[in-house]
Amino acid sequence: MQAVRVVEAAGPGKGEPLEREVRALRRAMFDHAILSMNALPDRIFDRAVREGWKRRSYVSLRTVTRVAPLSVPLWAWLAKEDAARFRLEEFLSDVDGLSGALRQYAPGLLGYAVWLLLFASASACWFAVWASLNLLLRARPALTSDVARLFKGLPRPEIFASGVVLAGFAVPVACGVGIAAAAVFWIALSTAYLRRGELVIGGTATLLLFGVFLCGGFLEAIHPMAGSARQGGWLGGEGYYYRDVSDSRDAGRGLLTGPQWERMARFARARAEMQGGNPRAAESLWTGLIEEGGDLADAYNNRGIVRVRLGKVEEGLADFEAAASLRPAGGRAQWNAYQAYLQEFRLEQAARIQPVAWAGIRSLVPFDYRAEEMTHGELIASPLRVGDVWRTLFTVREEGLREARGSAFHDMFFRPVPGGWVPAFLAAGWVWAALWKLLSRKVWMSSVCRSCGAGTLVVGSREATDICNACRAQVGKGIRGGEERERRGLSISLHRRYVRACSILFPGAGALWAGKELRTMLYGILLSLSAGLFTVSWSAGRLAGGLIGDMQTDIWRAALGAVAVLWLFGAAWGWRSFETVQLYHNVAGERL
């Protein structure tokens, strides 16, 4: 009920009533060993949106940081607002709060780890699509010439060859092939006609797709925890208080098997029992955890709180001292021992540890604990540490390949390749590229001049032959007049139009024709990161509400603007780069 009063007291111009309700809620939270009411900021923000004072909600949300210090969305939203208003001091404070919440709130870390993995996967997929299409367009003229050699007995073989090459692009799309599988196929089609720098782009795209495959397995592994963390599931006990969280069936639902996960589930269940007002059940759970061994400082501290609540002050003090000896810089155990000494009127012992206790709780970022205000025997519980969750997640990642075979990413990006064959399929793309690079030194294949578009048959390194002799000699349309000059002029004009069209539709293509492979790859990475950020944030902005939805909406709008700017820059840069190459070889600026 007190949390509801805080939500109702929030509003523009209600600073003093809200402060009063926040202080009352904080006292109630200490009584139940609740560290943070993470649902409060979202409730207040939703109310502000409904009642039309969203833009004036900053003061209210700043006030509730004292009762929702582990709310990562709250700190991130405040940091965004401070950056927009150029409040440097508040911004730095909010960044400290954000980092502190990420370090200490395990469910928050899970959720943001999922978001980062989705962002990385989306960016990698966009890079693979961008790279594969640009490389296919780069190789298309030479590939069409080689396919036309297969139809040399037919009239106008180049028409049939163009249809075959177009089918190589369109058939995977029409058949519903996953975008990752299609990208590998397109890169494989282009491999024989690429320079070394372009092969690096294709190989990087293939490696990133393997990373996407592994990310799918990783997300599949942590989905049972991340999906229930914000709804008050087994890991939600550190930031939310729900009456049914203490149910053992709820605490273990969706949990991965293994001793690490089972211990973490019991830790969260014991914290939920503390919050739910069941000290005897919590004491039993903490005792069981301590008997198992491992990292015991937090368990000792929490059991000490429970025992003090049960009137077992001596036993509680022993637990606090044990926790302080195991983790001297922890802060919580020293403060709790100090409070217990005061309750027992052991003033000498209290005075001895007072400086350490006061300094310790001041350093517990993002918690705004002020010793001079805490005069009612407030005891500070220990949360489930993020380090435990993160280390255990790394253990789960060893099984990521097995999980990836049945993940949603496999069905979405790699169909119809069977899950067990995806690594072999991606490796085959690499082997194919290596074999064609070796065979190209022995097999005569078509090559197209990067400057004028003239085709020829070459064998060996493409770097030495991708500028024709006429362009090296800078003879323009040629020395001879008549039909030969007209044919060369038409070839130059068509090639120029083709590259310019590619530069507009697929930014960066013109720079590839200009021979700027590594700079083009860096540009593609920036474009893909912006597109990936837009993809993930747009989805989250539509589905999520509260502070997260508001921030995601701002992010996808900024990301969309970045994509538009980068697209225009890439088109102009590619156009200009190719124009510079043609000017250098004396084939630009002429009109038919």
Language model feature labels by segment:
Residues 39-42, 73, 264, 298, ...:
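Start-of-helix register in tetratricopeptide repeats
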Residues 66-72, 79-105, 324-325, 331, ...:
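TPR/TPR-like (Sel1-like) alpha-helical repeat modules
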Residues 195-202, 208-244, 436-444:
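Hydrophobic alpha-helical transmembrane segments in integral membrane proteins
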